[in-house]
Amino acid sequence: MTRIVFMGTPDFSVPVLGTLIDDGYEVVGVVTQPDRPKGRKKVMTPPPVKEEALRRGIPVLQPEKVREEAETDKILALEPDLIVTAAFGQILPKKLLDYPKYGCINVHASLLPELRGGAPIHYAILEGKEKTGVTIMYMVEKLDAGDMLAKVEVDIEETDNVGTLHDKLSKAGAALLSETVPRIIDGSVTPEKQDEQKATYAPNIKREQELIDWSKPGEVLYNQVRGLNPWPVAYTVLNGQTLKVWAAKKCQALKQAEPGEIVTVEKDGIVVATGNDTALKLTEVQPAGKKRMKAEDFVRGAGLQAGMKLGHDDEK
């Protein structure tokens, strides 16, 4: 029986691990990131993959740095025939990449060579793409640059956010892996080199990308809001306080106004002027120190009115 070591960390990886187990492979170990403090109370929380592995009775390793020789040797001691990774979060050393007879493969949430890196789901929406997908490829020492083994496309609906698209891609990745692993083992898979000229990148989201720049067109800001939901969430500033924007709708500007100016306050949202004489309706927000709420509930308590401005020149 093929011995597999699985390496992954967040929710995206859980269905991928489950598929390997359900397909009858001998998953001899799971490698994931260490437990991390989470939430306001900083409670030490295990990664979702660790919880799933323990539930399934599979041994778990949690190296701080997998590239340290002692940690690498622990994984090699499991004698894997194949290593499968999905959103693991660390680069593997050559010693590990070279060991398994069937190689090391990665389940990546984009149509490579587009959107290499740690945040491909975010960038697919931020860039306004209408489709993305999952690629399974051999791992090499360069980030997401190995030969491709299989791909599947996934449509991006206009109402998708990172959360909904994440779930679609996770399921698609698990199904694609189920089809691909047998072909790797029997040698029928045909690797395809990536075109480096077409490579684009999706590095981890930075704090400055979360800030809404109201001078940009409404379409761009709509993609920003859904491309940062449920994490890390786009924000603006109102009266010197952070206001997170969880959800919005595209809408027409009823009159010309300065970008960031509240044009109208309606029952179902706050219409804000954006660049190029466009507008965005904020439908779900979160004031500093409070829970997220429907815009109509926020409006009731905040005394918002047309003509007020969101955002300041000094917001950084």
Swiss-Prot record:
Entry binding sites for (6S)-5,6,7,8-tetrahydrofolate: S110, L111, L112, P113
Gene Ontology terms: cellular component: cytosol
InterPro entries: Fmt (IPR005794), Formyl_trans_C (IPR005793), Formyl_trans_C_sf (IPR037022), Formyl_transf_N (IPR002376), Formyl_transf_N_sf (IPR036477), Formyl_transferase-like_C_sf (IPR011034), GART_AS (IPR001555), Met-tRNA-FMT_C (IPR044135)
Gene Ontology MF: a single term: methionyl-tRNA formyltransferase activity
Reactions this protein catalyses: L-methionyl-tRNA(fMet) + (6R)-10-formyltetrahydrofolate = N-formyl-L-methionyl-tRNA(fMet) + (6S)-5,6,7,8-tetrahydrofolate + H(+)
Annotated disulfide bonds: none
Superkingdom of source: Bacteria
Family: Belongs to the Fmt family.
Protein known as: Methionyl-tRNA formyltransferase
